[in-house]
Amino acid sequence: MDNFSYLVYIPSLNTKKRFIQLNNNKHISIVKFIQNKDVYLAEYLVSMIEDMCIDNINVKNLTGLDLLCILLAIRNICIGTRLELTTDVNNEKSSLTLDLGDILKRVTDIKTKSTTIKIDNIHVTIEIPRTLVIESYIDFISKIKINKSVYDMRSLSKSDKHKITDLLPGKVVTSMYSKIGDLSSPITIVKGISTLPEMVIDATTSSIFEFIKLIFDSNLSNFYTYYYLLASKMHLDLSYIDNITPIETEIYINKYKEEMEIAQKSIESESKSPAVGNIPAPSPGAQSSESIIPGGFKF
């Protein structure tokens, strides 16, 4: 094993799988998908999870909660455990810092269950969807039994699923809707206040996918500024920058800032010293162009 890897607990499998790190290249791709509102973001994330897992894993068998746990762990290890939320409503600003490590523990502890609806000669088993984006009640169905015919809905194409569910009478579908809300216990991430709306993670809604977008979104302009500084000022190869993690990138940037601050203080100190010989003293406040450092950037 050449690269650093780490274990991630997957609730539905009740086991841990080993993953490699998220690099800048992948993170930028995620951010672009998010900001372009691209419908293929969910597909990209699932494919990325499969690529990053060293152990054998069938991502098609993972629930939305499993995928959230994996992505939260990746985010915590490779980007950081803190997420700062800010809003500005009616000129009233609010900010809140979330501990994603704590949220991962709470999500891991969410209890899920399956239930079977039995009406006449029809048995329908519903479970937490194995997808990030929930399109309809069909995503909750894992198995349908009509008389002696049994259909494994997880193995069917979307069109075949619709053909089977079209056979279900209205009273079965109505019963399913009433049972779906009982499959999971939602957790509150943010309690609603005047300028920050309530945020809840519920495995029976699309809140999981929306939360994933929130924790991975970032400022693309900052990324390119970081790339410029690391390549032009610290002389790092672009392929190397592509393949380090966002948190490693921030360490490099902070180190560069520290060096420039030391250089700036040295220049200011020299500017206050008396001139020696024929060497003119720098004018007060003089600084090199390299001492001007973009600040305030955060992932």
Predicted regions and their residues:
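Long, low-complexity, intrinsically disordered segments
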Residues: 284-299
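Intrinsically disordered, low-complexity basic tails/linkers immediately adjacent to helix-turn-helix/homeobox/MYB/SANT
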Residues: 271-285
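An amphipathic, hydrophobic-aromatic interaction surface with interspersed Lys/Arg
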Residues: 1-273, 298-299
